Amino acid sequence: MTKSSKDICSENEGKKNGKSGFFSTSFKYVLSACIASFIFGYQVSVLNTIKNFIVVEFEWCKGEKDRLNCSNNTIQSSFLLASVFIGAVLGCGFSGYLVQFGRRLSLLIIYNFFFLVSILTSITHHFHTILFARLLSGFGIGLVTVSVPMYISEMTHKDKKGAYGVMHQLFITFGIFVAVMLGLAMGEGPKADSTEPLTSFAKLWWRLMFLFPSVISLIGILALVVFFKEETPYFLFEKGRIEESKNILKKIYETDNVDEPLNAIKEAVEQNESAKKNSLSLLSALKIPSYRYVIILGCLLSGLQQFTGINVLVSNSNELYKEFLDSHLITILSVVMTAVNFLMTFPAIYIVEKLGRKTLLLWGCVGVLVAYLPTAIANEINRNSNFVKILSIVATFVMIISFAVSYGPVLWIYLHEMFPSEIKDSAASLASLVNWVCAIIVVFPSDIIIKKSPSILFIVFSVMSILTFFFIFFFIKETKGGEIGTSPYITMEERQKHMTKSVV
């Protein structure tokens, strides 16, 4: 079919203005970073699939009638589940420092780190060594939490930051899905009342599953070393490499006219440099009401995400489903759940720029409430009825879908759009750290609470989703389409007032 002159003119105008399709140059750069997001999701989920095999091989319930359910296993499993999140807190705290040396360099360090840690985890033989290895895995995840969204934010067209930002969450869910799929090779898992030892294949396979991220890390290293050697335009400009910054912007915007984004970066860098000269550190910013306000909002928004209960479902779903299902259905349902989580993240790529960040966050809270509240009430009335068991399972899927298209991907986009450039690195790191601290608070006791009464979790998550809805409705502002380094919470005049005053 021959194109009309009008169509050709329209295409040329699009190129001139730097408008291109989703699968543009930026897409390739984003993919190179999202390999780390995949490792993130895989590392969070892998233990959920293979935990019982480790319990049997390490004999945590030795001498007990039930080799899977004993007090020693409950305590050690809780520590093992929480160790990743504790490590992530430490990683987030360090990530703000690491990204100062380069966004691409940060990713390269992360891939090398995961390569070594995955090997270490696969050769552990004791509780203390596997606990240490999982802490290190969590540390790497904490680095990913800040580095990848920052890289994506600085390597993409301003009108597509949301869509590309969703890819971080998409690859996290893909990693979760792959971890569960690989676990299928071992079957249903060891029986609690059996004395039969693990097969040689099972003993080998769970270690290979821990080793798998090292292979993915090598792919990430290869991508950055061979194909994607450039740093982000913001970082390059900040280091005085103006022409390099301009050249990479031409690739990102697919046009020679990049004056507008270059000027936006210039203004952001100047504000950041002024902040450094005037010693506007995170602690200094917290003393200024306008900056303190946006930092607190970011930390609250980040922490509240964990009270949707998403990491309880991801890291401990097998334990939760034991309350409702026979063992032969648990693995199948976990696979379906992770597949839904992965697939339902795709719509967010397209709707995050159409509906905006705030609208998606609000609808996500409504979805979580609709999922949990009826389930909590039904569990209190008659926990053992088949209807309540089915309702509980359906609720987890409604929650997963709601999270996948809203709070999951949107938070990491928002944290790198809400803060002004002079505090973005440190404030985003702090907010991410708060997210992982809240994950520990939620995940650590979940194993014990599930055994006592799952409805307690449903009630807590229901109440928190209501509080989160009103918090977002009244306090959170839209950031869609904003220039890099700006903030809807602090005017340029307010920022300049603090940037231009003399150092005392």
From Swiss-Prot:
Its main location: membrane. Changing residue 315 to Y: Reduces D-glucose and D-fructose transport activity. SUPFAM superfamilies: MFS general substrate transporter. Disulfide bonds join 61-70. Beta-D-glucose binds at residues 169, 305, 311, 341. Changing residue 305 to A: Reduces D-glucose and D-fructose transport activity. Changing residue 318 to A: Reduces D-glucose and D-fructose transport activity. Inhibited by cytochalasin B. Inhibited by compound 3361 (3-O-((undec-10-en)-1-yl)-D-glucose). Inhibited by compound HTI-1. Residues 1-29, 100-104, 151-165, 229-293, 353-358, 414-429, 477-504 are cytoplasmic. InterPro entries: GLUT (IPR045263), MFS_dom (IPR020846), MFS_sugar_transport-like (IPR005828), MFS_trans_sf (IPR036259), Sugar/inositol_transpt (IPR003663), Sugar_transporter_CS (IPR005829). The keyword Oxidoreductase does not apply. One of its GO terms (molecular function) is fructose transmembrane transporter activity. Belongs to the major facilitator superfamily. Sugar transporter (TC 2.A.1.1) family. It holds the Pfam family Sugar_tr. Active from 32 to 42 degrees Celsius. Retains 50% of its maximal activity at 20 degrees Celsius. This is Hexose transporter 1. One of its GO terms (biological process) is monosaccharide transmembrane transport. It comes from the Eukaryota. Keywords: Cell membrane, Disulfide bond, Membrane, Sugar transport, Transmembrane, Transmembrane helix, Transport. Sodium-independent facilitative hexose transporter. Can transport D-glucose and D-fructose. Can transport D-mannose, D-galactose, D-xylose and D-glucosamine. Changing residue 317 to A: Reduces D-glucose and D-fructose transport activity. Gene3D superfamilies: MFS general substrate transporter like domains (1.20.1250.20). One of its GO terms (cellular component) is membrane. Residues 51-78, 126-129, 187-207, 315-331, 380-392, 451-455 are extracellular. Homodimer. It catalyses: D-glucose(out) = D-glucose(in); D-fructose(out) = D-fructose(in); D-galactose(in) = D-galactose(out); D-mannose(out) = D-mannose(in).
